[in-house]
UniProtKB/Swiss-Prot annotation:
Keywords: Ribonucleoprotein, Ribosomal protein, RNA-binding, rRNA-binding
InterPro entries tied to this protein: NA-bd_OB-fold (IPR012340), Rib_uL2_dom2 (IPR014722), Ribosomal_uL2 (IPR002171), Ribosomal_uL2_bac/org-type (IPR005880), Ribosomal_uL2_C (IPR022669), Ribosomal_uL2_CS (IPR022671), Ribosomal_uL2_dom3 (IPR014726), Ribosomal_uL2_RNA-bd_dom (IPR022666)
Role according to the record: One of the primary rRNA binding proteins. Required for association of the 30S and 50S subunits to form the 70S ribosome, for tRNA binding and peptide bond formation. It has been suggested to have peptidyltransferase activity; this is somewhat controversial. Makes several contacts with the 16S rRNA in the 70S ribosome.
Pfam families: Ribosomal_L2 (PF00181), Ribosomal_L2_C (PF03947)
GO cellular component terms listed in the entry, alphabetical order: cytosol; large ribosomal subunit
Region (Disordered), start-end ranges: 214-275
Stated family: Belongs to the universal ribosomal protein uL2 family.
Basic residues composition-biased segments: 255-275
Species of origin: Blochmanniella pennsylvanica (strain BPEN)
One GO MF term: transferase activity
Any single GO BP term: cytoplasmic translation
Subunit and interaction comment: Part of the 50S ribosomal subunit. Forms a bridge to the 30S subunit in the 70S ribosome.
Gene that encodes the chain: rplB
Source organism superkingdom: Bacteria
Protein's UniProt name: Large ribosomal subunit protein uL2
Amino acid sequence: MPIIKCNPTSPGRRHVTKLVNHDLYKGNPFSSLLSNKINNRSGGRNNYGRITVRHIGGGHKKRYRIIDFKRNKDGISAVIKRLEYDPNRSANIALLSYRDGEYRYILAPKDVKIGDFISSGANVPIKPGNALPMSNIPIGSIIHNVEMKPGKGGQLARSAGSYIQIVARDGEYMILRLRSGEIRKIRCECRATVGEVGNAEHMLRMLGKAGANRWRGNRPTVRGTAMNPIDHPHGGGEGKNFGKHPVSPWGIQTKGKKTRSNKRTNKFILSHRNK
């Protein structure tokens, strides 16, 4: 996918680099696969109106596309009708048309194109875009959209350019290596999609100006040292050095403190990403 650099016709255009994909559909999304929910309009507030997630607010209105993460339509092949941009995620999406007339969106894998046939099931061929239980996928294969519980739908490796490698099998479990370096066990009957997620060049784009980030619903991040003592533990003082270990606005250590609290699933992690 070519990356173009914009001409410096203004300070906001000087450093902009964009991805150009001529295969993406230019029209409206498939209407029956749109949710009534308008995404990212909470402003980071909960039902009491209090901020629970900082740095969220504004941005362009966007409709949520209903993505098929379960890939449970077995025995019926589908053809890729078009590839589309999805404002809710970094990956592109593909519109599938099944032989029985049903349409579904999936994450667009790398190296698939319009007109390709895709299927799911226990005995489908090993090729990018096909979904099947991991017990039927060869060791060493690259996969994405991996389930953590059978039938729940893919939860791992869903962003642009991400993938997971199957490294071994241990009885009822498959041993997977994640991009973070973590190695974990997941049950063999969990489904995964062959190949890696497309649009890996997404990370090479440059927005070029702060306003482009605001279009996406991201608000500014203010340094703690620039605040007053009432607002942040790093605030106040005459100089820039705050003279203590860095902490969050609520006094929790930010450098190296473990935050994982789900001890119930620790037994499935064979090697943590930090080791």
